[in-house]
Amino acid sequence: TRKAITERIKDTDVVIELLDARLPGSSANPMLAELTQAKPALKVLNKQDLADPARTELWLAHYNSLPGTRAIGLDASETTPAKRLIAACHELAPHRGGMAKPMRVLICGIPNVGKSTLINTLTGKKAAKTGDEAGITKLEQRITLASDFYLYDTPGVLWPRIIVAKSGYNLAASGAVGRNAFNEEEVALELLDYLKQQYAPQLEERYKLENVASMQDEVLLSAIGRKRGALQGGNRVNLQKAAEIVIYDFRAAILGRITLETPGEFGQWMAAGQLVDAERQAKKKKRQPEKA
């Protein structure tokens, strides 16, 4: 995929990166930033109808402050996003357009971020397979949005190495990572740890609990399991089932409109992750024998 994007980027005017509005930083792929750094970028915060509106505004302002970058939010219910996407791309590359110089746009995104659904909406037909299980998109395809506007699709790409632990949990909570790749109980505990600090009223309303902010994560998960009837023999809570309930309620926005990171938080996580990763790489290099 890296090779395919590298080849295509040479003849691309604008790169659209589709992000999950509930976790914009974590759903961005650092490899794309590296490969496309010289190209104008349109960041599309998809699923904004599931995200915290105030935090979406923070992220849009953050991306719009970056050079050569525009950002817009999209709702899943939006039926005519093509006009907004085309207009934003023309703002970024005003020198392109018309039959002699058609706009060439690359669209990228991690698995399950809603890229296939968006492409289907843009084209008005089932051009791409859709579903809610993280998976592999077919090979690159060209989609004509207007007589002078070509959109090139790419397979969904996850981080080559997830160096930010919190991002790994957020990606798993959102459904970007296949079920076999993570422990649901761990993910639910991380999710609850954040939600009880930032979205306590939503948790309390949904699960009919009080003072969740002061509860330990394991106690909170157990209390939710009991409230939701996730019980097994001996009237014990089935923590696996309770974890599945919490993750499902987040994904389906049953807990309300939630965003799992702000630009400031993500910046801190990334800085810490890069530091740890640099130390790890240095140790790894030290262990390798010197070449003669």
Regions found by a protein language model. Give the residues of each.
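Glycine-rich, N-terminal phosphate-binding loop of Rossmann-like dinucleotide-binding domains
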Residues: 19
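Canonical P-loop GTPase G-domain recognition
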Residues: 42, 48-109, 127, 229-231, ...
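Generic structural marker for isolated residues within well-ordered, non-membrane alpha-helices
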Residues: 60, 116, 221
